Amino acid sequence: FVNQHLCGSHLVEALYLVCGERGFFYTPKTGIVEQCCTGVCSLYQLENYCN
């Protein structure tokens, strides 16, 4: 997993992959779209959104 742009369904799929059974919280207010879609994010940054 390298730092990459993740938008829309790709972002959701990546969160499912990273978080697994823990699940994740996805609200527009968290800035994940700005971080991962507008910019790039790492696996470690995605883990911050897991429950």
Swiss-Prot record:
Disulfide cysteine pairs (residue numbers): C7-C37, C19-C50, C36-C41
Protein origin, superkingdom: Eukaryota
Name of the featured protein: Insulin
Protein species of origin: Elephas maximus
Protein keywords: Carbohydrate metabolism, Disulfide bond, Glucose metabolism, Hormone, Secreted
Subcellular location: Secreted
GO annotations of cellular component type: extracellular space
Note: The species of elephant is not given, but it is most probably the indian elephant (Elephas maximus).
Function, as annotated: Insulin decreases blood glucose concentration. It increases cell permeability to monosaccharides, amino acids and fatty acids. It accelerates glycolysis, the pentose phosphate cycle, and glycogen synthesis in liver.
Matching CDD domains: IlGF_insulin_like
PROSITE patterns: INSULIN
Subunit structure: Heterodimer of a B chain and an A chain linked by two disulfide bonds.
